[in-house]
Amino acid sequence: ITQGVNPFLATFVAFLAGCAAGLITGLLYTKGKIPTLLAGILVMTSCNSIMLMVMGRANLGLLGADKLKSTWISVSAVLLVLVLIFYFLNTNLGQAFIATGDNVEMAQSFGINTGRMEVLGLVVSNGVIALSGALISQNDGYADVSKGIGVIVIGLASIIIGEVFFGNVSLFERLFAIVIGSIFYQFLILAVIKLGFNTNYLKLFSAIVLAICLMIPTFKDKIFKGVKLNAE
C-alpha cells in the first residue's frame, strides 16, 4: 500500500500470505508430526521476522496512502466471509471438515482424509485472520508487528459469548452469533475504558471475561438441574 499498490490487491495478497502460513503450519503438523501448538509457534515466530523484513521496521504508518477505510467495506467483508463459510460447510467437503472437527476417529472410519481436512482448516482460518489484520491496519492507519498479540483471547471470547447467548441455533445463526459475540466483547472493553480503568489492565480484564464466559454453561447446567430437582 505504501508503494502505491491497489489496496484491494494488497489486501488479497495479505489473505494469500495468511493461507500460506496456515499451509506451512498444517504440513508441519500432519507431515512433520510436530505438535500443533509448537508448529504454530514456529510459524508465528518466522512470520514475525518476515513482517519485519517486508515492513523494514516494527511500526509503519499508512497515513496519506490509498487504503480501504470504510465501515461498509468491513461489514461487506464480514458478510462475504460468513456466506462463503456457510456455503462451504454445506458442501460434501464441508461436512467432512465438520466431521473431522467433531471426532477425528469417527471421520477416519468413514474414509475421510483427516490430515487434509486439518490442513484445510488451518489454511482457511489463517487466511481469514490475515484478511482481518489487513483491514484493521488500514482502518487504524498503521501496521505493527505486535498488533496480533492477545487476539486469540478476543477470538475465544467472541466464540464463547456467542455460544452462551445463542445456544441451539442453525449453522448460519451460529456463525453470525460469533460476529455478535465479538461486537459484544468490544462493547465490554469500551465500557471498561469509559469507566476510567487503567488501559494497562485490559488484557487482564479480557482473561477474566473469557474465564467467566467459559464457566457460564457449567453454572447454567447446575442451576437448571437444581430447578428441575426442586420441581420434582
Write out the residue ranges for each language-model feature:
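Membrane-embedded helix boundary and interhelical linker motif in transport proteins
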Residues: 1-31, 55-56, 60, 194
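Helix-loop-helix "hairpin" substructures at the membrane interface of multi-pass membrane proteins
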Residues: 6-8, 21, 70-152, 157
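Transmembrane alpha-helical segments in multi-pass inner-membrane proteins
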Residues: 14, 129, 133, 139-204
